[in-house]
């Protein structure tokens, strides 16, 4: 059986790691040991931050919606509650986009949310209505 030497494979692996470490600063871009550690860490950061990006964008959308809704005289929580009671199911990404690019449509959404909140306030019985004074 022929002897297997790993030179070609090792060289290919090293080239692959150094290719991934392009653009890194200092020793991290040209020594295998430092580059391997830096590349591994960068992959961990990339994995973590793909999850964080979703949270960050959701928070941004909520801030934008809140700002637009407050200009209409309502709070974010009441607005979302009104939309759900009105049966309007639009996600926060689309709502923030509408608030920025289509203010008239957004005003109509706010009006329908307010209407749903007012309607439900008028129809729900008061808990203290039958209480003796």
UniProtKB/Swiss-Prot annotation:
Coiled coil: none annotated. Binds directly to 23S ribosomal RNA and is necessary for the in vitro assembly process of the 50S ribosomal subunit. It is not involved in the protein synthesizing functions of that subunit. The gene is rplT. InterPro entries: Ribosomal_bL20, RIBOSOMAL_L20_CS, Ribosomal_protein_bL20_C. The keyword Aminoacyl-tRNA synthetase does not apply. It comes from Bartonella bacilliformis (strain ATCC 35685 / KC583 / Herrer 020/F12,63). Transmembrane segments: none annotated. This is Large ribosomal subunit protein bL20. CDD domains: Ribosomal_L20. GO terms for biological process: ribosomal large subunit assembly; translation. Gene3D superfamilies: 6.10.160.10, Ribosomal protein L20 (1.10.1900.20). GO terms for cellular component: ribonucleoprotein complex; ribosome. Belongs to the bacterial ribosomal protein bL20 family. Keywords: Ribonucleoprotein, Ribosomal protein, RNA-binding, rRNA-binding. Pfam families: Ribosomal_L20. One of its GO terms (molecular function) is structural constituent of ribosome.
